[in-house]
């Protein structure tokens, strides 16, 4: 709750105060009621004597626990007053309890709402290495299950954490006041209850940690298998994947069984010790209280109500222990969850730079001695001492074998990774001094993995301009025209207009109802609509046929003459038209020149081009 306390509005703060207040009021009433019930029982057991007193003209005196007594004119008045008082107290307790529950529910629900909002906003801002470290399955668990546990403990804090000690302390005080002889039994069983709860609580914490790890593994397993179901189907890997899931599921079952068993022992042990308390109390009262006889004689009337009240307060003491143990279970689970949430919230964020005096920059890109490794260790850099410069308005290619580091360069250009060494310059300015918003609007990247969002084709293409400052005052008509123009450049209009609902065609989650080529063209249009001044294609035309790819390249060259274009690909045919081509091998630059010159002075480029010719990779004759 403390993580979002500052974000509480006045309504939530009011509920935060009222919840414990009405909980306290409810407990006070609950503790008073047994005293009135005991007095009512004393009236019932002494009814004959009271009638005799009444006939003799005497007032009726009813004793209450704690030594207080009230005089009544007759038996009927005593019955009516006591019955009415108990009913009114019960109704007040119910009313206060309902208000307390509502306020606690309101606060806990808003706590989870604000916490989930805060975590989600953080996930959208954490650095790519942090995201890669945790993985989407673990992040999903922390956003859902862990936040739910925090909601539970917030409710417990406002209700049970206050209710449990009040029931215990209040029950203990009233029990001692009711009958000191019977209260001796509490000295015997009370330490045993504390010992049991302490031992079980200590054993449960590591089990909950292991249980949360098991949940992460199951989510990771499910996410991987569901995402790769086509591979599983094609290779008939059902038994293999079922076995892997079974292992993860059995690990969770084992940890869950142990944690549930340990924490469930609280209740039976507590009830056992409660019954033991009652037995010891009865033995003590018959041994120590000489007013109690074997036969139900009138002199026993005073002790019988006290025995009833003592049992009631003993129940409150036991209930306080049970609520404490249940709260401790949730507390231990939430403490593990809180640590995991704090771990996420403490992760470094993408740096935001504000420069109100930001000037227009030429779309040039320069790497100066850039080194980078996913391990973030300078002595383990994969990209080694990269230095090159892309001039404005020209087209550049980046090519290299699989795993050579091409996509790493794209991610560094897009600001997803920060280099361990070296400098990046845009328009001759160090990237650290450029306004972040200006930079994001200046650079556009079409990533290797084309992620589309659930919605429509229109919403997916226009999502790129929804938050841009230069589009805020544009009309829907202007946005639609820009969308159609971007789709035309990306050759996406040819299939979009075949749909009956055209640009309003439904797109399922991750674009599952579109083909690979269709998704790539929508993704290209989504970036083109932003009119970036530096445009990066990270192997983002791989699903297009040769004719369509050539047409898209030609459209981009003709329509984006004032844009610096960077095309990353393994296919020589996709980049050989570029003004210059950067050849990467194992994280190092092995060539940077035009296609013709690289064919003379770069052996790797020569080998790649020859191998792709042999495989039918040169499509010039076809095109």
Curated annotation (Swiss-Prot):
<feature type="domain" description="ABC transmembrane type-1">
    <location>
        <begin position="16"/>
        <end position="325"/>
    </location>
</feature>
<dbReference type="GO" id="GO:0016887">
    <property type="term" value="F:ATP hydrolysis activity"/>
</dbReference>
<dbReference type="InterPro" id="IPR036640">
    <property type="entry name" value="ABC1_TM_sf"/>
</dbReference>
<feature type="transmembrane region" description="Helical">
    <location>
        <begin position="266"/>
        <end position="286"/>
    </location>
</feature>
<keyword id="KW-1133">Transmembrane helix</keyword>
<keyword id="KW-0547">Nucleotide-binding</keyword>
<dbReference type="GO" id="GO:0140359">
    <property type="term" value="F:ABC-type transporter activity"/>
</dbReference>
<feature type="transmembrane region" description="Helical">
    <location>
        <begin position="81"/>
        <end position="101"/>
    </location>
</feature>
<dbReference type="Pfam" id="PF00005">
    <property type="entry name" value="ABC_tran"/>
</dbReference>
<keyword id="KW-0472">Membrane</keyword>
<dbReference type="InterPro" id="IPR003439">
    <property type="entry name" value="ABC_transporter-like_ATP-bd"/>
</dbReference>
<dbReference type="InterPro" id="IPR027417">
    <property type="entry name" value="P-loop_NTPase"/>
</dbReference>
<feature type="domain" description="ABC transporter">
    <location>
        <begin position="365"/>
        <end position="611"/>
    </location>
</feature>
<dbReference type="GO" id="GO:0005524">
    <property type="term" value="F:ATP binding"/>
</dbReference>
<dbReference type="InterPro" id="IPR039421">
    <property type="entry name" value="Type_1_exporter"/>
</dbReference>
<keyword id="KW-0813">Transport</keyword>
<protein>
    <recommendedName>
        <fullName>Putative ABC transporter ATP-binding protein MG014</fullName>
    </recommendedName>
</protein>
<feature type="transmembrane region" description="Helical">
    <location>
        <begin position="27"/>
        <end position="47"/>
    </location>
</feature>
<keyword id="KW-1003">Cell membrane</keyword>
<dbReference type="GO" id="GO:0005886">
    <property type="term" value="C:plasma membrane"/>
</dbReference>
<feature type="transmembrane region" description="Helical">
    <location>
        <begin position="157"/>
        <end position="177"/>
    </location>
</feature>
<comment type="similarity">
    <text>Belongs to the ABC transporter superfamily.</text>
</comment>
<feature type="transmembrane region" description="Helical">
    <location>
        <begin position="307"/>
        <end position="327"/>
    </location>
</feature>
<feature type="transmembrane region" description="Helical">
    <location>
        <begin position="181"/>
        <end position="201"/>
    </location>
</feature>
<dbReference type="InterPro" id="IPR003593">
    <property type="entry name" value="AAA+_ATPase"/>
</dbReference>
<keyword id="KW-0067">ATP-binding</keyword>
<keyword id="KW-0812">Transmembrane</keyword>
<dbReference type="Pfam" id="PF00664">
    <property type="entry name" value="ABC_membrane"/>
</dbReference>
<dbReference type="InterPro" id="IPR011527">
    <property type="entry name" value="ABC1_TM_dom"/>
</dbReference>
<dbReference type="InterPro" id="IPR017871">
    <property type="entry name" value="ABC_transporter-like_CS"/>
</dbReference>
<feature type="binding site">
    <location>
        <begin position="400"/>
        <end position="407"/>
    </location>
    <ligand>
        <name>ATP</name>
    </ligand>
</feature>
């Amino acid at each position: 709750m403390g993580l979002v306390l500052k974000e509480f509005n006045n309504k939530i703060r009011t509920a935060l105060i009222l919840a414990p207040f009405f909980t306290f009021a409810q407990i006070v009433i609950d503790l008073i009621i047994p005293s009135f019930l005991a007095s009512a029982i004393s009236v019932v057991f002494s009814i004959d004597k009271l009638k005799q007193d009444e006939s003799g003209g005497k007032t009726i005196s009813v004793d209450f626990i704690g030594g207080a007594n009230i005089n009544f004119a007759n038996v009927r008045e005593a019955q009516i007053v006591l019955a009415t008082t108990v009913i009114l107290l019960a109704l007040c307790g119910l009313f206060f309890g309902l208000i307390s529950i509502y306020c606690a529910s309101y606060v806990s629900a808003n706590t989870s709402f604000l916490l989930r909002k805060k975590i989600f906003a953080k996930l959208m801002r954490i650095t790519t290495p942090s995201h890669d470290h945790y993985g989407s399955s673990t992040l999903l668990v922390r956003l859902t299950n862990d936040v739910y546990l925090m909601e539970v403990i917030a409710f417990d804090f406002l209700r049970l954490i206050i209710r449990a000690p009040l029931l215990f302390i209040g029950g203990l005080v009233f029990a001692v006041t009711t009958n000191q002889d019977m209260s001796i039994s509490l000295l015997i069983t009370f330490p045993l209850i504390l010992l049991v709860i302490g031992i079980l609580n200590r054993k449960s914490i590591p089990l909950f940690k292991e249980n949360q790890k098991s949940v992460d593994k199951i989510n990771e397993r499910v996410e991987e298998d569901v995402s790769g179901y086509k591979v599983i189907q094609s290779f008939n890997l059902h038994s293999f994947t079922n076995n892997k899931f079974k292992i993860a599921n059995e690990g969770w079952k084992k940890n869950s069984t142990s944690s549930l068993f340990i924490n469930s022992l609280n209740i039976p042990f507590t009830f056992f010790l409660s019954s033991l308390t009652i037995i010891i109390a009865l033995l003590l009262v018959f041994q120590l209280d000489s007013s109690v006889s074997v036969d139900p004689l009138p002199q026993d009337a005073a002790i019988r109500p006290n025995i009833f009240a003592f049992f009631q307060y003993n129940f409150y003491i036991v209930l306080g222990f049970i609520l404490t143990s249940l709260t401790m279970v949730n507390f231990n689970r939430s403490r593990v969850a809180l640590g995991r949430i704090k771990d996420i919230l403490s992760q470094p964020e993408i740096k935001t730079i504000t420069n109100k005096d930001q000037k227009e920059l030429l779309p040039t890109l320069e790497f100066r001695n850039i080194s980078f490794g996913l391990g973030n260790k300078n002595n383990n850099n994969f990209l080694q001492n990269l230095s090159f410069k892309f001039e404005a308005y020209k087209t550049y290619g980046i090519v290299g074998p699989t795993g050579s580091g091409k996509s790493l360069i794209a991610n560094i250009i897009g600001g997803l990774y920060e280099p361990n060494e070296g400098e990046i310059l845009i328009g001759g300015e160090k990237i650290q001094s450029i306004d972040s918003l200006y930079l994001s609007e200046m650079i556009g990247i079409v990533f290797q993995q084309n992620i589309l969002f659930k919605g429509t084709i229109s919403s997916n293409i226009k999502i790129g301009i929804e938050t841009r400052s230069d589009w805020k005052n544009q009309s829907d008509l202007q946005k639609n025209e820009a969308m159609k123009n971007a789709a035309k450049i990306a050759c996406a209009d040819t299939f979009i207009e075949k749909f009956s609902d055209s640009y309003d065609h439904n797109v399922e989650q991750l674009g599952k109802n579109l083909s690979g080529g269709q998704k790539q063209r929508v993704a290209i249009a989504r970036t083109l609509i932003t009119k970036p001044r530096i445009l990066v294609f990270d192997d983002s035309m791989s699903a297009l046929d040769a004719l369509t790819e050539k047409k898209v390249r030609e459209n981009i060259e003709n329509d984006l003459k004032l844009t610096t274009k960077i095309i990353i690909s393994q296919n020589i045919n996709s980049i050989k038209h570029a003004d210059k081509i950067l050849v990467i091998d194992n994280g190092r630059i092995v060539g940077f020149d035009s296609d013709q010159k690289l064919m003379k002075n770069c052996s790797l480029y020569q080998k790649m081009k020859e191998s792709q010719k042999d495989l039918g990779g040169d499509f010039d004759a076809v095109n």
